[in-house]
C-alpha cells in the first residue's frame, strides 16, 4: 500500500465534504519525507522508513537518487529541493552530502531569528523560480518566526501538451452538475474520436486516458521518450466520487491498474477545462496515518540532521509540513505544480477487466484525475474536480 496516497483520502474527503476542488502530489510528499528521514534516528527514522516502504535508510536514499535521476531525464518536468538553515544551526556533514547526492537538496543560510519575513521571502523566491512563477507567496508573512530553525522545501513544475490537441472550435459550453444539486455552465473540451478508455461497471466508474506528447529535451517528438498521460476517472453515479477515491487510495496500484489497454470509439467525449489551486496540511494527515514521531516535540529525533550552536543546545522536531498545488487544463495541454515544505523548530525538552464496447464519456459531474508517467508507474499528481468554474 502506498501510504503517501492515503493522505489523499484524509484531505480529499474533507474537500469533497466542503465541495472544494483538490489536488496533491504524492511524489512531492514522498520526496519531502525521504529528505527528512535522512536526518532522523531511532523511532522517528523507523516510522518514516515503514511509511515510505523501505527497510533501511541506505535503501531509501538509493531509491531517492534513482527517482531524482529519472525526473532530471523527463523534459516535461523540473524539480528542485532546498534546505534553508538558520545561522544558529550547523548541518551535519553526512546529512548535507547525502541530501545533495540523493535528493538534489542544497543548503542556504538564512536568519529566521531576526529576519523571519526576509527568510520567508527567500523560500518563496525559490518556489516561484522552481515552478516558473506558477506558485507565488506560498509562505505567508508570519509563518516563520524566531523559533524556526530549518526549512526543507521541494518544488515541481510539470508542463506538457496533448499528443492530440483539442481544437478550440470544438470547445462547448454545457452544464456541470455540482454535488449539492446546483449546476454551473462551463467550457468543455471535446474530441469525439477513438481514445484509450475503459468501463468498470462493477466498480461504478469509467476511465479516459489522454496522452501527452512524447518529447525529448530538444523539444522534438521521440519514441522512447517519457510516457506521460492524464487519467480521468468518472464515477457513473453523480455522488460516486467518495467511493472512487476510497478505492484509489486503498487498492494496491489502483491508478496504474486502471490504465486502459485498448482504443475504442468514444462519442461524445467531453471533459471540462479547469484551473485551481489547493493546499494541504500534511502534518495533520500524516499524524492520523500513524506517522507521529517527527511531529512530536517529546519523541522526535532529528539528531542526524544538524547541531545547535546555542547554549543549551536545542533538539528539533517538525512543527509544520504543508503542500500547495496548482493545475490548469485547457485545449493545449496541462500545467501542474507543487511545493512541499517542512518547518523544523526546537523542542522544549486492481480491478476487474473492463468490457470493450462503444461508450460515451462526458465528465459533467465531480470526477477524479491523475497525472502519471505510466512506464515507470509514477503518480505525479492526484486530485478531483468538484466545480470547474471555481479557480480558487
Swiss-Prot record:
GO cellular-component term (any): extracellular space
Coiled coil feature spans: none
Pfam families, per the entry: Serpin
SMART domains the record matches: SERPIN
Site, as annotated: Reactive bond: 347-348
Location of region: RCL: 333-357
Entry similarity comment: Belongs to the serpin family.
Protein name: Putative non-inhibitory serpin-10
Lineage of producing organism: Eukaryota, Viridiplantae, Streptophyta, Embryophyta, Tracheophyta
Amino acid at each position: 500500500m502506498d501510504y503517501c496516497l492515503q493522505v489523499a483520502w484524509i484531505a480529499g474527503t474533507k474537500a469533497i465534504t466542503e465541495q472544494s476542488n483538490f489536488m496533491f502530489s504524492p511524489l512531492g510528499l514522498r520526496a519531502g519525507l525521504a529528505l527528512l528521514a535522512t536526518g532522523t534516528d531511532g523511532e522517528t527514522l523507523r516510522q518514516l522508513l515503514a511509511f515510505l516502504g523501505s527497510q533501511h535508510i541506505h535503501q531509501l536514499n538509493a531509491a531517492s537518487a534513482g527517482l531524482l535521476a529519472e525526473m532530471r531525464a523527463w523534459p516535461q518536468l523540473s524539480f528542485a529541493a532546498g534546505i534553508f538553515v538558520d545561522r544558529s544551526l550547523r548541518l551535519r556533514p553526512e546529512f548535507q552530502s547525502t541530501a545533495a547526492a540523493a535528493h538534489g537538496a542544497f543548503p542556504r543560510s538564512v536568519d529566521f531569528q531576526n529576519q523571519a519575513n526576509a527568510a520567508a521571502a527567500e523560500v518563496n523566491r525559490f518556489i516561484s523560480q522552481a515552478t516558473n512563477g506558477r506558485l507565488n507567496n506560498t509562505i505567508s508573512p508570519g509563518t516563520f518566526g524566531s523559533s524556526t530553525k530549518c526549512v526543507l522545501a521541494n518544488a515541481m513544475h510539470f508542463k506538457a501538451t496533448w499528443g492530440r490537441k483539442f481544437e478550440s472550435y470544438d470547445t462547448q459550453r454545457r452544464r456541470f452538475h455540482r454535488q449539492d444539486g446546483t449546476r454551473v455552465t462551463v467550457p468543455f473540451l471535446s474530441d469525439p474520436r477513438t481514445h484509450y478508455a475503459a468501463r468498470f461497471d462493477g466498480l461504478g466508474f469509467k476511465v479516459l486516458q489522454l496522452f501527452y506528447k512524447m518529447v525529448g529535451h530538444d523539444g522534438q517528438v521521440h519514441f522512447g521518450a517519457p510516457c506521460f498521460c492524464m487519467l480521468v476517472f468518472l464515477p457513473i453515479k453523480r455522488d460516486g466520487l467518495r467511493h472512487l477515491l476510497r478505492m484509489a487510495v486503498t487498492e494496491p496500484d489502483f491508478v496504474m491498474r486502471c490504465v486502459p489497454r485498448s482504443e475504442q470509439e468514444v462519442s461524445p467525449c467531453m471533459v471540462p477545462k479547469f484551473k485551481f489551486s489547493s493546499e494541504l496540511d500534511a502534518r495533520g494527515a500524516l499524524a492520523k496515518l500513524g506517522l507521529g514521531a517527527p511531529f512530536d516535540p517529546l519523541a522526535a529525533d532529528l539528531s542526524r540532521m544538524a547541531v545547535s550552536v546555542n547554549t543549551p543546545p536545542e533538539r528539533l522536531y517538525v512543527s509544520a509540513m504543508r503542500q500547495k498545488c496548482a493545475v490548469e487544463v485547457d485545449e493545449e495541454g496541462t500545467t501542474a505544480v507543487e511545493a512541499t515544505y517542512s518547518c523544523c523548530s526546537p523542542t522544549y525538552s486492481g480491478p476487474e477487466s473492463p468490457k470493450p464496447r462503444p461508450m460515451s464519456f462526458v465528465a459533467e459531474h465531480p470526477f477524479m484525475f491523475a497525472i502519471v508517467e505510466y512506464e515507470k508507474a509514477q503518480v505525479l499528481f492526484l486530485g478531483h474536480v468538484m466545480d470547474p468554474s471555481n479557480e480558487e
